[in-house]
């Protein structure tokens, strides 16, 4: 789910127009509920270091920091940053996007990388059965020198695990820069620009979706919320392979998260244009 300015995350506004408070540029998403890590811990500089924030100078002040976070994503090659289509489809083609892998977007003097371009799956927004919710941000060749890149899954990876009964008790890492949320009472969404990780339990596997539980009260674990869209999902048994990316969830971030699978023919057809597939 895409980020909305945290100061505007009052419950009424959230339910009425989850992603509509950005004004420069405008970009209501077709799937619209935004998403962020909650029930988690800061990753620090070394853990999940190749998970980054997608940024745009929304306030046009020339300073790129936590106020400019749009979504989360992950580095899948030295020059390719993977995120969600609904994070970028509203931008003009010449929009200057940025990526930062800083663990705290409000830290002084964070490094930001000016993207050289971006594109998203042309099927996005045209197929309600399969959202094609993928985008890639292109980075300069030497900008990520020395950084590790994440792997993509083999074809049918999650199906194979399901067939073996290996998913029912599986847990997954959520990693992102999004907001937290209050577990009970009136919804609240604190945001601090810090990259965090949490763990969620498996819920269901669909042809294009991985669903995870994020009911903290019931499971004692965490989830994601506003600002985590495009962020990676890893099996806790393999934190190097991005098996899905965040697309959406319930508006108050207390039930389930719905994540777009990367092991399907649709995902592989798009991503295979930009990176070598396993």
Positions of the model-derived regions?
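Bacterial N-terminal signal peptides that target proteins for export
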Residues: 1-8
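C-terminal motif of bacterial Sec signal peptides marking the signal peptidase cleavage site
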Residues: 15-18
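C-terminal subregion of chymotrypsin/trypsin-like serine protease catalytic domains
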Residues: 20-36, 44, 70-89, 95-101, ...
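Chymotrypsin/trypsin-fold serine protease catalytic domain
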Residues: 25, 130-221, 257-258, 264-272
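Conserved catalytic-core segment of clan PA serine endopeptidases
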Residues: 33-46, 65, 93-161
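A conserved glycine-rich beta-strand in the N-terminal activation segment of trypsin-fold
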Residues: 51-53, 59-78
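Generic short beta-strand segments
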Residues: 53-59, 176-180, 248
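Solvent-exposed loop/turn segments at secondary-structure junctions
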Residues: 80-81, 87-89, 125, 142-145, ...
């Amino acid at each position: 789910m895409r980020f909305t300015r945290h100061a505007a995350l009052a419950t009424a506004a959230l339910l009425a127009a989850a992603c509509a408070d950005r004004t420069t540029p405008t970009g209501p998403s077709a799937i619209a509920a935004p998403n962020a890590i909650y029930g988690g811990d800061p990753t620090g500089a070394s853990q999940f270091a190749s998970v980054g924030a997608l940024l745009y100078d929304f306030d046009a002040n020339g300073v790129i920091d936590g106020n400019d976070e749009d979504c989360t994503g992950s580095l899948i090659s030295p020059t390719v940053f993977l995120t969600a289509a609904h994070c970028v489809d509203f931008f003009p083609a010449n929009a200057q996007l940025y990526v930062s892998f800083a663990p705290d977007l409000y830290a002084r003097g964070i490094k930001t990388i000016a993207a050289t371009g971006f594109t998203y799956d042309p099927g996005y927004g045209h197929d309600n059965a399969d959202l094609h919710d993928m985008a890639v941000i292109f980075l300069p060749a030497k900008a990520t020198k020395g950084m590790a890149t994440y792997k993509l899954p083999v074809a049918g990876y999650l199906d194979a695990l399901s067939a073996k009964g290996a998913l029912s008790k599986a847990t997954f890492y959520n990693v992102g820069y999004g907001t937290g949320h209050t577990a009970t009472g009136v919804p609240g969404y604190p945001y601090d620009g810090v990259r965090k990780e949490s763990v969620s339990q498996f819920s269901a596997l669909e042809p294009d979706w991985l669903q995870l539980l994020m009911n903290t009260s019931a499971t004692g674990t965490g989830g994601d919320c506003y600002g985590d869209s495009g962020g990676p999902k890893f099996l806790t048994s393999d934190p190097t392979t991005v098996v899905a990316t965040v697309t959406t969830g319930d508006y108050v971030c207390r039930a389930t998260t719905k994540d777009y699978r990367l092991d399907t023919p649709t995902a592989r057809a798009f991503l295979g244009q930009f990176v070598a597939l396993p």
